[in-house]
Amino acid sequence: GMLFTATSLFSQVNISAGSTVTQNFDGLGTSATATLPTGWKVDKNNSVRSVGTYSGAGTATELIAGNNMSSSAQNGIYNFGAGVATSATDRAIGGISSGSASKSVNVYVQLTNNGTTSINNFTIGFDVEKYRNGKNSAGFTIQMYYSTDGSTWTSAGNDFKVSFVADANTDGYTSAPGATTSISGKTLSQSLAAGSSLYLAWNYSVTSGSTTSSAQALGIDNVS
């Protein structure tokens, strides 16, 4: 069975050996300035493929989008809806770059081992959903990172990377998301002692180079 454990007394997501944590972001609701679930944070910066710090990140989105996302959509942090942005119940979190801003959007979670035994490794899955095409020739990627302190990050590698190749246009989708790629059951070989925290970050950015115009809009969903 799936168990999402969080407490209002602490700002992290609690986990213990053998337990499962899931998050589908549907609790975001339909507000552009939606508050993230406990233990989750988000930020944006103007450097490509750059992860910030968990402590410095915020706890709310800035914008919403869903069906028919505009080719001139504002850059920033999005609460995406699978369907009509203002009413869809299935939500995801992510963003979109412009040529000069939001070159990276990062979604973070702090996992704290509140059990009595060490966790030897983590089995992780997540979906990457595409809410708008982008004709930037490099394409866009979501890459997961991990950290023991929330500020120094290590790439989790290709098993935790989803890239989309360039599209012919920057159109939205009549029925969003227009594409979904799932990462399922991949092992992150990182131990976590009782009482300690592990931080994960999902970085959205252009796949290569530094040109971020004509971007694809990507979000993450169904983290487990």
Regions found by a protein language model. Give the residues of each.
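Intrinsic-disorder/low-complexity, polar/charged segments enriched in Ser/Thr/Lys/Arg/Asp/Glu/Gln
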Residues: 20-22, 104-108, 121-123
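Boundary/junction segments of secreted and surface-exposed precursor proteins
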Residues: 8-28
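Surface-exposed, low-complexity/disordered Ser/Thr/Gly/Pro/Asn-rich loops and linkers
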Residues: 45-117, 218
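Terminal, low-complexity interaction segments
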Residues: 25, 100-102, 114-119, 126-129, ...
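Short, solvent-exposed loop/turn elements at domain surfaces
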Residues: 31-36
